[in-house]
Every structure is written in C-alpha cells, then in structure tokens.
Amino acid sequence: MAVTITLKTLQQQTFKIRMEPDETVKVLKEKIEAEKGRDAFPVAGQKLIYAGKILSDDVPIKEYHIDEKNFVVVMVTKAKAGQGIPAPPEASPTAVPEPSTPFPPVLASGMSHPPPTSREDKSPSEESTTTTSPESISGSVPSSGSSGREEDAASTLVTGSEYETMLTEIMSMGYERERVVAALRASYNNPHRAVEYLLTGIPGSPEPEHGSVQESQAPEQPATEAAGENPLEFLRDQPQFQNMRQVIQQNPALLPALLQQLGQENPQLLQQISRHQEQFIQMLNEPPGELADISDVEGEVGAIGEEAPQMNYIQVTPQEKEAIERLKALGFPESLVIQAYFACEKNENLAANFLLSQNFDDE
C-alpha cells in the first residue's frame, strides 16, 4: 500500500511524494530530483533527515516508520552559485573563495580607519599576502567587492521571527532546543551551516563558548605578519568596541542588523576587516569584561575611533518607547528588551515571543 511522504526544505517549502513501502530512500531521492529538478535537488547532494537521523540510501522507507502526519527534512549540500566553499588550510592565497557566511560587524559609520602607516610599512609582496585570506571560516566577513555581495551574505542569516521559525524547523528534525541554539550560535545563525554542525558535530564545546571559534581556526598567520602586527589593534582599547563585542557575544541574533549597518555606513572599514579576518575574529572572541547594554552600544556605534562630541544616537519614536516599556513590564531587563526589540525588527509581538522562548535570566 502506497504511502505519502511529506517533505520540507530549510526554506520551508513543503511538497509530497508517493512511495511504496518497499522502495528505498535512494528511490525517494530520485523522485525528489525528478519533481524538483536536478539543478536544485541533485540526488548526490540530498540529505534526508527524520527524527534527527539521516536516512540511508539502501534502506527501505518502511524501516523508518515515517508518520504521514510528520515530515522529512530535505537538505541539499550543493554549493550555491556565486558563493565559495571554505578552502582547506593549504589553499593558495591567490584563490580566495567568497565566504558563505558573513561575520558580524560590530562597528559603524563613525569608526575611524586604521593608521595609514600600517599599510605603507609593507612591501607589495607582503601586502598581497596579508590582504588575502587563504581560508573562509564560518565567522568570516563578506568579500568587499561590492555592496551586492554584502547583501547576498546578509541574506544567509536569519533573525527575529525568521530565527524563531528556523529554530522550530530544525528542532522538528529531532534535536533538542539547547543543541539547536548552540549550533545556530556556532554558525552565526546560518541555518544550513547549523544543520551541518548538528549532523557532523558542533565545533568545540556544545555550550556557547566563544573561544571554540577561535580555537577551530586554521591555518597559522602568514610569515610576513609578525606577532603584534595586527592592523586592527587600534580598536582594542576603545570602550565602544569593547561594549559592542560584549553585546554580540550576549545576543548573536543582532549580527545581521549590525552586518547591514556596517556595509551601508562604513564599507571602507568592512574592506579593511575582510582583509584581516583572523585578527578581527580573535579580537571579537576575547573574553568580555563587565556586561554592556545594547542601549549604550547603539549610541556609541558611530563614535568608535572618534571623539565623544561626534557620537551618534539611535532615536526611537514615542510609540517604540511605549512598546519597549510594555515588554519591560513582562519582567525582563531593559537591556534584553531592547536587544530583542531591535533584533525582531521592532515587532512587539515577535520580541515578546522571543524573550519568553529564550528564558533569559535577569542580569
């Protein structure tokens, strides 16, 4: 007796395939390819997941006891056109892939550029070595070729209501919420990378230890970059940068908004950071001091690298302020309320759901 298999992609597209119980998973993949197209759903690139397990090609469908009321997740591991695949540590510096996942900027328009001497002191050969990265890590900044690429990179992340929806979708594969949250955090909210982590193992500790990202990075710095020659060193002692780093470590859901802010307001600095990804990530992963409030950081974003009189502040309308006050009345600290409110694109209901689902502890 034929059964109906409901399938759902990570983009939340749902479709159904009729199968005979004795037919194998491989046959199901072939039917998916035939219906959806070889380019989008090649058999070789498909991974079918049910109840947290990858379905084996040679196993009959009936062996997995798939409930027709539930669904099988279809994940395609084929690389998208225009996006690079992380290169191995031995890759040549001249073949630089475009990162598949953007790394969050923590800076904005007011941030000063690094001292020009940091570039003038290098020979042309050194410059070509230090301004191209031989790897694309999960937390890399986007290639600085064009604003279009920055937008493409930002589109791979989820935030706000999309974050909560994606969290639920991945949990429906059979994973616990804690592990899904850890995988999303490790992948900087890239759902495809997060599922890969759940299947192959989350880098480092399953707990959100920020040092694991730093420890997982290969390879060593190029020989021409001696220790202490970090061109982004000028950021380290700036209080605004320190506060922004702390806020990002507290709430990774703010990463997409900050990425867009940097790309729009200070593309030159984004270019500089993209040339020195490893140093920037190491600085961002350094242990924070006292916790910072997003309300403080939002006003300081434009002042990094400049004098205090040039600080920019984010203004909120009276309606937005009332919404923030109502969220605070639910019992959450103001800093967390503001984080959630802006992360959910100023949608009060989504922010409330986000706060309640995260089970934040009062600071």
Curated annotation (Swiss-Prot):
Main location: nucleus
NCBIfam families: rad23
Domain UBA span(s) in chain numbering: 161-201, 318-358
GO biological process, one term: positive regulation of cell cycle
UniProt modified residues of type Phosphoserine: S123, S128, S133, S136, S138, S205, S295, S357
Origin: domain of life: Eukaryota
Compartments it resides in: Nucleus
Binding partners and assembly: Interacts with XPC; the interaction is suggesting the existence of a functional equivalent variant XPC complex. Interacts with PSMD4 and PSMC5. Interacts with ATXN3. Interacts with UBQLN2.
Organism field: Mus musculus (Mouse)
Region listing for Disordered, in residue ranges: 83-160, 201-227
InterPro entries, A to Z: Rad23, RAD23A/B_UBA1, STI1_HS-bd, UBA, UBA-like_sf, Ubiquitin-like_dom, Ubiquitin-like_domsf, XPC-bd
Domain notes: The ubiquitin-like (UBL) and the UBA (ubiquitin-associated) domains interact intramolecularly in a highly dynamic manner, as each UBA domain competes for an overlapping UBL domain surface. Binding of ubiquitin or proteasome subunit Psmd4 disrupt the UBL-UBA domain interactions and drive Rad23a in to an open conformation.
Record's protein name: UV excision repair protein RAD23 homolog A
